[in-house]
Each structure stands twice: as C-alpha cells, then as structure tokens.
C-alpha cells in the first residue's frame, strides 16, 4: 500500500481562487476591499521570504496590502503605537505581526495589543479562549489549514485516536482543541513524553509539529493512519524535509502530506480566509 498524497498546494490554490472570486463580488456590490497590514521587524531572511509570499498572496486575491518594514532597533513603544493606529484604521481588517521578533521586544504584549477582531493569525488569548470554549471566531491559521486538509480526505474523524507531536502555542495546543471539536480522542506529546513511538503507533491520525527533522520514524506509523507533517527543515544540501521520515512512512500511511507542498500553503491561504471573514462578519 502507498499512501494517498494530501496536496496542500492544490487545495490552497483552490481556496485562494474562491477568496478572489468573493473579493470581486464585493467590489461589484460596492463593498469595501479587505485590507491586511503586515509588520516585519528586522532582516531575518526566513521572515522576509514569508512576508513576501503573504504580500503576493494578497495581490493574487485582490486584497489591499499595507507593508511596514521596520528596523531591528524599533522600540516596544513604537510598535505599540503602530498597532494602535492600525487597530483604529477602518480600512484594515487584519494585522499580521511577523514572528520571531528581535530579542528586546515582548511578542506576547504586542500580540495582545492587536484587537481580537483583527487578529487574523488567531494568536490573541481571546481567540484561543473562544476556540477552547467551542465558539471559535478567528482560528489559528496552521491548525485551521490542517482541518481543511483533513476534510479533503473524506475520512470521518469522529472517534479517531489523534496524536499531536509538539505542544507549541502556534500549532500543537490549538490543534488539540480543533481535533477535540472534530470528535477525536487527543493525545499531545512533547519533549518529556515517554515512549513516543508507542503513542504514534496507536494513532489513527498523527500531526507532527516539533521542528526536528526525521523525529517520527516511518515504521512507527500505524497501517492506514493519516499523517500530517507540519515540520519544514532545511538540510545541509539545501533539501527541505519534514519531521516525519517520509520515505518509510509513505508505504504504511493511508494519507500523508508532502514536505514541501503540504501544510505550508494552507497556513498562508487560511490567513487570507481569516482576513476575508473579518471583513465580512466582524467589520460590516
């Protein structure tokens, strides 16, 4: 058996097409064009690439994109003032603060400064709290994108044993809440977990988001399981690999995401989806 590939690139392209169509319809109806403000502090190369992709995505779907490229020595107060200004700007539906920030800045305080109805990354405690209370509003982009990928398989998640490897605030923890909402029995593994192989081996669905290349061995995977690999790691030869050993997982899994081309494109597409939702439902 060889796993079915979950093509995140194609699914994300379809989602962007739907968003672009809705933006065009809004224009025809005389409604405001959705706006996204992207804040980048410093010159981190990976962050610069991510931000350029997000700006291109905005252009593709017809959003108005505002770019704020700030120097590395930008102060906490200057960033706070900028966020306050964007919070009050009716043309801005979403505010994205690109992480990581330089060490002298307090990311938690700045993320909390973003108005919850403009928090299109879904990181604000208010939005995480709503997800925990089973009344999600703006949902964290990567877990939201993963749920769309899972829906594309047509598999019924109710009652599945789901294992998440990695307990970050960005992926692991909100992913656990998403899968609970979907009716899964959820186990979250982390750096102190004993017998990781045993947990993975019992899972009908595995989501791996640890940032460690090859952490999950293919032979651990249960026959027919769904494998979602969030990891994206660059090797010395320049090749991008995930947190799962893809070659050995492929013949065992029922469904699997490739790296690259799996989860990453969906994270970006869901940022656009959240921005459109904010424009249509929260900023009427």
UniProtKB/Swiss-Prot annotation:
It comes from the Bacteria. One of its GO terms (cellular component) is cytosol. Pathway: One-carbon metabolism; tetrahydrofolate interconversion. SUPFAM superfamilies: Aminoacid dehydrogenase-like, N-terminal domain, NAD(P)-binding Rossmann-fold domains. GO terms for biological process: L-histidine biosynthetic process; methionine biosynthetic process; purine nucleotide biosynthetic process; tetrahydrofolate interconversion. Its EC number is 1.5.1.5, 3.5.4.9. Pfam families: THF_DHG_CYH, THF_DHG_CYH_C. Signal peptide: none annotated. It catalyses: (6R)-5,10-methylene-5,6,7,8-tetrahydrofolate + NADP(+) = (6R)-5,10-methenyltetrahydrofolate + NADPH; (6R)-5,10-methenyltetrahydrofolate + H2O = (6R)-10-formyltetrahydrofolate + H(+). Keywords: Amino-acid biosynthesis, Histidine biosynthesis, Hydrolase, Methionine biosynthesis, Multifunctional enzyme, NADP, One-carbon metabolism, Oxidoreductase, Purine biosynthesis. Catalyzes the oxidation of 5,10-methylenetetrahydrofolate to 5,10-methenyltetrahydrofolate and then the hydrolysis of 5,10-methenyltetrahydrofolate to 10-formyltetrahydrofolate. Belongs to the tetrahydrofolate dehydrogenase/cyclohydrolase family. Homodimer. This is Bifunctional protein FolD. It comes from Pseudomonas entomophila (strain L48).
